[in-house]
Design a protein with these regions (language model features):
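Structured C-terminal helix/loop/strand segments within mature extracytoplasmic catalytic/sensor domains
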Residues: 2-140, 158, 166, 278-296, ...
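Short hydrophobic alpha-helical segments used for membrane anchoring or interfacial signaling
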Residues: 148-154
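Active-site SXXK
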Residues: 156, 166-197, 217, 341
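Mid-domain, small-residue-enriched loop/turn segments at the edges of structured enzyme/sensor domains
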Residues: 160, 214, 225-279
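A glycine-rich, coil/turn loop motif that links secondary-structure elements
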Residues: 163-168, 202-206, 253-262
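Short, well-structured active-site flanking segments
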Residues: 183-209, 281-285
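Short helix- or helix-capping micro-motifs
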Residues: 212-221
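A conserved catalytic-loop motif detector
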Residues: 260-319
C-alpha cells in the first residue's frame, strides 16, 4: 500500500483494502441466516450451484493454475510424508528447545553468515557453496534489496544474509495470515471453515466460505479472497496473535496494508510457528499443509528441483512502482529433516527475478549438509 494514505482512500487493488467494511460478526451472522433460510425451504441444490459458479477474480500476480494431476501429486506427497514430518518436527522441538525469541539471535549483515542457536559450534560452508550463494545474492542486489534465512529445525544451525532487510512481502504473507485464522480462530471453534462470509465492505463474496477463500488465497494467490479474509478477521485477535509470537507489530507488519513490509527474520519466526501448527495432526492443519504443498507458484520448489523434497510455501511477486517484490518462504521436508527457508527481495517481478530467487533457493538448499 502507498505510504501516507489511509485504507479508506483506496479502491480495491493489490496492496490495499476495500473502502468501507462491516463488522466481522455481523457479516458472518448475515451469511448464516441466509444459508439457514435456504436450507429450510429446500434450496440446498441452488446454493451448491451458486457456490460452483461464483466468479473468481485472480490476483494480478497470478500464474496459470496447476492442473489437477499436479495438485493430486502434491497432496499424495503430503499424505505419505505426514507421519515422518510430524515426528521430525516434534523431535526438532525437543532437540533444539528453541523459542521464536531465539530467532532474534540470528546474525544480520551484508555478507553471508552462518549461525547456531543452540551452541557455539558455528557451521562452516564449503568454498564452492559459499561462492554459489554469494553470486546468486549479488544478482539480486543488482536489482533491489535482498535478504534470506535458511535454518535446520533439527540442528538449530543456519545460513543468513541481511536477515533484517525490510521488503514489501506481496502475497508471501497470505499463508501466514491464514495460519492465524486456522490456528487462532478455527481450532478454537470461533470460526468454521464452512462459514460463508457474505458481504464485507460493500464487496459481495457470494456464497464463498472461509474454506473457499483460504484455498483461493493460498493455492492461487487470489487477492480478493485474501482481502475479504482480512476484512473479516483482522479485528478478532490478529494483533494479539502477532504480538504473542514476539513480532513487533508496529515496525515488522504495516498495520495500514493488507500486504505488509517485513523481513526474513520475521518471516522465519512465523514459518517456525507454521511448522509447529502443521505438526499438530488436526484435520484443519493437515488440510492447510496440503494447500501449501499445492501452491501454483514456488520459486523455492523450482530452484531446488528435488522430487524427494516436500515444499510447503507461499511466494509473492509484483512489479509496481513503490512495491516491487519477488519473494518466497516456506518449509522443506527432505531425508527426515525439516528446514525453514525465507528469501525476500525488492526486485521487480520478472522471469529474470524469478530465476534469481530460484538460484538463491538452490544455493541455500545445497548448504544443508553443513548445517547437520
Amino acid at each position: 500500500m502507498r505510504k501516507g494514505a489511509s485504507r479508506d482512500e483506496y479502491v480495491p487493488q493489490h496492496g490495499s483494502r476495500y473502502g468501507t467494511r462491516g463488522t466481522p460478526s455481523r457479516g458472518l451472522a448475515d451469511a448464516r441466516i441466509r444459508v439457514t433460510k435456504i436450507a429450510a425451504i429446500g434450496m440446498l441444490t441452488l446454493a451448491v450451484i451458486i457456490l460452483g459458479i461464483t466468479a473468481k477474480t485472480y490476483a494480478s500476480e497470478r500464474m496459470a493454475r496447476s492442473d489437477a494431476s499436479t495438485v493430486q501429486t502434491q497432496n499424495k506427497k503430503v499424505t505419505e510424508s505426514k507421519a515422518t514430518a510430524s515426528q521430525t518436527l516434534s523431535t526438532a522441538s525437543l532437540k533444539t528447545r528453541l523459542s521464536k525469541a531465539d530467532f532474534n539471535d540470528i546474525r544480520s549483515g551484508d555478507t553471508v553468515q552462518t549461525f547456531s542457536l543452540v551452541d557455539d559450534q558455528i557451521p562452516a560452508l564449503e568454498d564452492e557453496s559459499l561462492a554459489a550463494l554469494q553470486d546468486a545474492l549479488d544478482q539480486a542486489q543488482e536489482l533491489g534489496d535482498a535478504g534470506a534465512v535458511f535454518y535446520d529445525l533439527s540442528s538449530g544451525k543456519g545460513v543468513t544474509y541481511n536477515a533484517d532487510a525490510e521488503v514489501y512481502g506481496a502475497s508471501s504473507y497470505k499463508a501466514l495470515y491464514v495460519l492465524y485464522i486456522c490456528e487462532s480462530l478455527v481450532e478454537t471453534g470461533q470460526v468454521s471453515l464452512d462459514d460463508s462470509l457474505g458481504t464485507y465492505g460493500g464487496y459481495n463474496m457470494g456464497w464463498q466460505t472461509v474454506r473457499d477463500l483460504i484455498e483461493a488465497a493460498v493455492v492461487n494467490s487470489d487477492n480478493d479472497s485474501f482481502i475479504a479474509l482480512r476484512a473479516a478477521f483482522d479485528r478478532v485477535g490478529y494483533e494479539d496473535w502477532i504480538v504473542g509470537l514476539g513480532i513487533d507489530y508496529d515496525t515488522a507488519l504495516d498495520p495500514m496494508s493488507d500486504f505488509p513490509t517485513y523481513c526474513p527474520r520475521t518471516s522465519a519466526k512465523l514459518w517456525r510457528e507454521m511448522s509447529e501448527y502443521l505438526s499438530r495432526d488436526t484435520e484443519t492443519s493437515q488440510w492447510l499443509s496440503g494447500l501449501l504443498a499445492s501452491t501454483t507458484q514456488s520459486f523455492i520448489r523450482d530452484g531446488i528441483a528435488d522430487d524427494q523434497a516436500l515444499v510447503r510455501n507461499k511466494a509473492g511477486w509484483i512489479s509496481e512502482a513503490g512495491c516491487n517484490a519477488t519473494c518466497d518462504a516456506g518449509l522443506i521436508d527432505v531425508g527426515g529433516d525439516t528446514y525453514i527457508m525465507s528469501i525476500m527481495t525488492s526486485m521487480p517481478w520478472s522471469d529474470h527475478s524469478s530465476e534469481v530467487v530460484a538460484a538463491i533457493a538452490k544455493a541455500l538448499y545445497d548448504t544443508r549438509a553443513a548445517l547437520a
